[in-house]
Amino acid sequence: MAAIYKGTLGLIGNPPLVEPVNLEKELGLEATILVKLEYLNPAGSVKDRVAKAMIKGAEEKGILKEGSVIIEPTSGNTGIGLASIAAAKGYRAILTMPETMSVERRNILKAYGAEIVLTEGTKGMKGAIAKAEELAKEIPNSFIPGQFVNPANSKAHRETTGPEIWKDTDGNVDIFIAGVGTGGTLTGVGEYLKSQKPDVKVVALEPAASPVLSEGKGGPHKIQGIGAGFVPDVLNTKIYDEIYKADNDEGFAAAKLLAKTEGILVGISSGAALSGAIAYAKKTENKGKTIVALLPDSGDRYYSTPLFTE
């Protein structure tokens, strides 16, 4: 029987878990690290799952229909996922994003036919959100999916990402770590894993330069995709057991090490997540345990950033 897909929506989800054995050997780790390569989704990131879920939900409710305009504030990846699906379904897409986001992300959005509205970088995601809300009032038949507040975000991970990790590890997962942007990934995966194994440790990773979860204060940082500067509505703050603060340099170093030891090129937030997994793998009490880190996207969206230029 031929295995041919009609379009790419059916390809979203089920990227593999990979054990970076060379990296583990290089660092002398005695815990097992498994990385989930979410950049293998059709539009290149974990946010494909969220974009699909939010658009599907809006269509089913009759909110999104022919002639509708999708407007969304994004740091890049959700916008790319939405732009990809909007192109396939014939919707107009307008994305607002901080001007500090990489040139590559902007160019990808343009390639999908989306319109980009850049906002002041110092205002972070709050500025992008405010601009999206302003545009929605001006443009008829517009719809803001609202990744920071839309329950479809965490639901997508609770119904897909979490079960995939559980199945692929045969339930052998002790620690799960993911960066917090909207909080949807950590919430959905964390809730599912704890429903199966209550003592799974869920670790929320945030930028050390913007410790909103741990210290209640935001700030500028270089880890694109996480650390929005506020606590998102989507985030279940009771689901994580610990918070790991990743600094810019260790995230960059981990991403570079993964490329040089495994031939896997990942993005900035992926490097940060990996750095957290490495830190936990080095702890004596975690010897023999399995640590799963979710890597949101690939390095090809960051060639113009310090990840590759420094």
Regions found by a protein language model. Give the residues of each.
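PLP-dependent amino-acid enzyme catalytic core
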Residues: 1-310
